[in-house]
């Protein structure tokens, strides 16, 4: 996702530079240049706004591993040390994160269109002792079933749903 933003920014910058130098070269005057640069800037802003899907749509279009990688970027931006586990045989955790104090969290990432149920809570609860973590989280772009909430509480598993995830991403300026 970051590469896509960089490419768009580079393309917009290159387009603006060509416009600036082309206008000056053909007119040898800065007045039309200022007008054209302003117009080009407005057009680029509008195009990027229209062509860039919202964070919600981006999340919903991601595949499972892509969602895990996006979460890794999000938690790195928030200051955590992040390790992605293997795509298969991950023993219930997709990411292992650690804060600046050394507090370790196992994360089970679920990119679902339906509500996340018991299985995700069971997976991350099992991964906490396996990886030597302090806590387990299940993070989703969706919601959780009531049964997931009931199982999470006694197992000290934190559930982060779509609303909380989007708020955190926006706070980290990843929208």
Regions found by a protein language model. Name each.
Residues 1-91, 96-175:
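Mixed-charge (Asp/Glu-Lys/Arg
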């Amino acid at each position: 996702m970051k590469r896509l933003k960089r490419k768009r920014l580079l393309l917009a910058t290159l387009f603006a530079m060509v416009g600036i130098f082309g206008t000056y070269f053909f007119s040898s005057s800065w007045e039309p240049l200022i007008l054209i640069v302003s117009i080009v800037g407005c057009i680029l802003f509008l195009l990027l706004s229209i062509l860039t899907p919202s964070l919600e749509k981006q999340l919903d279009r991601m595949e499972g591993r892509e969602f895990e990688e996006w979460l890794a970027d999000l938690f790195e931006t928030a200051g955590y040390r992040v390790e992605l586990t293997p795509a298969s045989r991950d023993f219930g955790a997709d990411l292992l994160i650690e804060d600046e104090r050394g507090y370790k969290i196992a994360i089970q990432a679920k990119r679902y269109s339906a509500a996340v149920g018991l299985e995700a809570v069971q997976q991350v609860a099992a991964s906490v002792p396996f990886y030597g973590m302090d806590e387990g989280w299940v993070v989703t772009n969706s919601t959780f079933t009531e049964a997931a909430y009931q199982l999470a509480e006694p197992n000290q598993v934190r559930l982060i749903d779509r609303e909380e995830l989007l708020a955190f991403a926006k706070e980290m300026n990843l929208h």
